[in-house]
Amino acid sequence: MKKISSNFFCIFSFLVTQILLAKSNRIFDYSHLKGSKLSINAGPLSSKRAIIPYSFTKLHICNSKRLQRMEDTLGEILTGNKFYSTEYLAKVNEDTFCNILCFNNFTERDVNFYKKLIMRRYFVNMVVDKLPAGLILYNNQTKQTMIRYFDGIPIGYIKNNTFYIFNHLQFHILLNKVDTDKYNVVGFNILPMSIEHGEDTPKCVTRANLLLQNFNKSPQPLKEGRTLFTYDVIYEYSDIPFASRWDHYKISRASIHWTGIFISEFLVGIATIFVICLLRKNLRKDIDSYNYRVSQFEDINEYDWKQVAGDVFRPPSVNKLLLSSMIGTGCQLLSMLSFTLFLAVIGFMNPEKRNNILNIGILFYCFCGLFGGYVSANFYRFWGGNSWIRVSVFTSLLFPGIIICGYMIINIILIIENSNAAVNFSDILSLFILWIFCTFPLILIGSFFGYKSNQINIPCEINKIPSYIPEKPWYLHYRYITFLTGLIGFATIFIEFNYVMGALWRHQIYFLATFLFISIFLFAMVMGELSILVVYYNLCYGDYNWWWKSFIIGASPVIYFGMMAMISGMVILVCGAISVFFCLGFLNKIYSEIRID
C-alpha cells in the first residue's frame, strides 16, 4: 500500500512540475534585439454579420501568391485559423513613416468582392509576436483615441453611398525594455486610414509629430485601377510586464459574464429549493406512510409512484442499443469537456497557441473512449443486451458519424465559397486515422470491461408482466414539457454560450474558462434537477417509462440552440447522459427506502 501511495505521489508531483514548467515557459525569453525583423502576419477575414471566413490572400493586396502560409496545427486547420506572412516590414525599435507597400491594380471583380466585405463588416485579424492587433479608433473632432480589442481591422467604410478603402495602416508596437538593445513586445495596435495618394508618390506625412494630419487628407475611394498601399511603424515604450501583456484581452466584458453567472445561480437556486422541498416533505411523508401501512397489512388502493416499484427499473421498451450508446457517448464527451476545461482553468492553455485547446480536446475525446465504451456496455447489459461488440461499434460510430456527415456538407459549401475554413481531404483523412487507430480500440476495451463488470444495483425486483399505465395530464407529456425545461436550461447557459460561439465564429480568443466551467456546472445541476421533477410527477401518475423521457428532458435545451446542429448534438448527448444518471440515483434512493412485498 505504501509503495502504491509513493508511486502515486511521484506521478502527481511529475504532472504538477510539468504544468508549472509549461506555465513558466510562457514568461521566459521572447525578447528581440534592436533592429531585428518583426513578422507581421495576417489571419482570416471574419465578420459578426457573416459566418463564412475568407483567407487574407483573397484581398489580392500586392502579390498574394508570394505570401507564405504559417505552420498550422490540427486545431488551426479545423477552425480555419490560417495565418500568412505579409510584406509589411518592421524592425525592432526603428520607426518608419509613409512606407510604400505596393501599387495594387484592382479589377472589377476585386472591387465587387471588397464591396461585399465592407458591407458585411469583415475585419482582418493581424498579429505581431503572436499578439492580436487592437483597433485604434480616432475621433477627428475631439482629437481623442480609444482602443478596441477582439474585432480586428476593418477593410474600409461607406460614406455618402461611396466605398472607401483603408490603404494606410499605422502600426503601434509597444516595447518593454529587457536589457541593452533587447526588448519584449507587450502590445500591438493598428490605426487604419484612408489616404488618396498621387499616381506614383504617397501623400502621407513623414514626420512623427504630424501623423494625425493624415486624417485631413482626401480618402481613397474603392475603384478599379491603380491604388497605392502605405504604412507606418511606430514604437512606444511601455512598463507592462511581458507576463501581463494578455491582460487587455482577458478583462473585456467580464462584468457581463458575472451577470450571466448570477442568472444561472438564480435559476439553479429556484430549482434546488423546489427539489429539496419535494424530497424532504412529500417523499419522506409518503415513504413513512407507505411503510407503516405495509407493516400493518393494510390495503393500499392509491396509485402513485410507490405502486410502480416493480416496473420503474424495467428496461426501455424501444431502442435500448441507441439509448445506451447515446449515454456512453455523452459520458465520453462530458469527460473530455471536464479534463479540457480543468487544464484551461488552471492556466495550462497558452493563449499564444490558443488553438491547442482544440488539439487537446480531440486527444481527450480519443482517450475518453474508455469511459464511453464502459458506460454504454454496462447499461446495455443491464437492459438485457447480449453483445458488447455491437454496442461498442455503435458507440464508436454514433457521434463521429453524425459529425463527419454534417462537417462534410459544411465543408463542401465552404469550398464552393472559397472560404478560408475549408479543410483539405488529407486533413480529414488524418482525423479518420486517429479515430480508427485510437478512439475505436479504446471504446472496444472500455466496452469489454463494462460488459464484464458488475451490473447496476437496483433496490427492486422487476415484475415479469408490465403494469398498466393510466392516463395522465396533458402537460406531463414530454412533447410539451420539453419546451418548458429546455427554456429554463437554455436561460441558464445562453449568455456564456453566446460569448463562446461569438469567439469561435469570429476567430477570437476566449480566456474566461472559469466562467465557462461554472456555467456548465450550474447548467448540469439545473437539467438534472428538472429531469428529477418531471420523472417524479410522471411516476405519481403511474408512468414508469422514464429512461427515454429523462434523456429527452436533459436534451431539451437543444430546441433553443437554433441551426448549430453539431454543437447541439454534443449538448444532447452530454445533457441526456447527465439526466439519466441523476434520475437513476434518485430512484435508487427513494425505492430503497420502502418495503417491497
Regions found by a protein language model. Give the residues of each.
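Membrane-water interface at loop-to-transmembrane-helix junctions
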Residues: 312-328, 424-432, 463-489, 509-519
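Hydrophobic alpha-helical transmembrane segments corresponding to the first two to three helices
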Residues: 247-415, 448-453
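Cleavable N-terminal signal peptides of Sec/SRP-targeted secreted and luminal proteins
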Residues: 6-21
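Soluble extramembrane domains flanking the early transmembrane region of eukaryotic membrane proteins
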Residues: 20-262
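C-terminal transmembrane helix-loop-helix hairpin of multi-pass membrane proteins
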Residues: 473-477, 481, 514-519, 543-597
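Non-transmembrane, juxtamembrane loop and terminal tail segments
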Residues: 293-305, 459-473, 591-597
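Transmembrane-helix exit/juxtamembrane "anchor" motif
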Residues: 273-288, 440-458, 526-540, 574-593
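Membrane-lumen (extracellular) interface motif
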Residues: 333-367, 373-394, 404-432, 493-516, ...
